[in-house]
């Protein structure tokens, strides 16, 4: 079901689970998640669960999309955000309605192409895409005052730390297998502060672009 009632039920659940940023909740409410999943799974699009999108990848659980977006925005508005892992484009679409510009890197070309089409369909024009290795970030356009990583890294990539602007915030899952933690990293005057926010489950952040 993709009815407004189904979407409202999801928003109520996210609120009850602790997502409190009104802008994030409103963007989740109006973003048609069913466009970002296979047609056969469209009836499950507004369940609070991750769903397969092919190529051994998933569209993230709506709670995780909302929570990671909220964490990025906690210190105020952002004008330049780097997303590592475009995937289905759903997180990209949500971010693009919350920040001024999104720069999104994806290693799987077919996923990136589909995501581009969906964002064009939704008339979301403030996103620039790069096909490449997420571990490297997008150094040519750095620095970024927000970085969001949608796959789990075994450690925080140094390249991404280097591309974070002073005062910038990075939200990233770190770990491997069953042991993964969501982290918030803030670039401060004398280094980086790291905050562990709890257990999560993401697909791995892999090296190298794929056609």
Swiss-Prot record:
Q: Which GO terms describe its molecular function?
A: protein-L-isoaspartate (D-aspartate) O-methyltransferase activity
Top-level taxon of origin: Bacteria
HAMAP family xrefs? PIMT
- Name the GO cellular-component terms: cytoplasm
Location within or outside the cell: Cytoplasm
* E.C. no: 2.1.1.77
The family line of this record is: Belongs to the methyltransferase superfamily. L-isoaspartyl/D-aspartyl protein methyltransferase family.
Name the major location.
Answer: cytoplasm
- Report the CDD domains cross-referenced here: AdoMet_MTases
Which catalytic residues are annotated? 60
A GO biological process held by the record: protein repair
One Pfam family per UniProt: PCMT
Quote the catalytic activity from the record. Answer: [protein]-L-isoaspartate + S-adenosyl-L-methionine = [protein]-L-isoaspartate alpha-methyl ester + S-adenosyl-L-homocysteine
Q: What is this protein called?
A: Protein-L-isoaspartate O-methyltransferase
Query: Keywords in UniProt for this one?
Result: Cytoplasm, Methyltransferase, S-adenosyl-L-methionine, Transferase
Function comment: Catalyzes the methyl esterification of L-isoaspartyl residues in peptides and proteins that result from spontaneous decomposition of normal L-aspartyl and L-asparaginyl residues. It plays a role in the repair and/or degradation of damaged proteins.
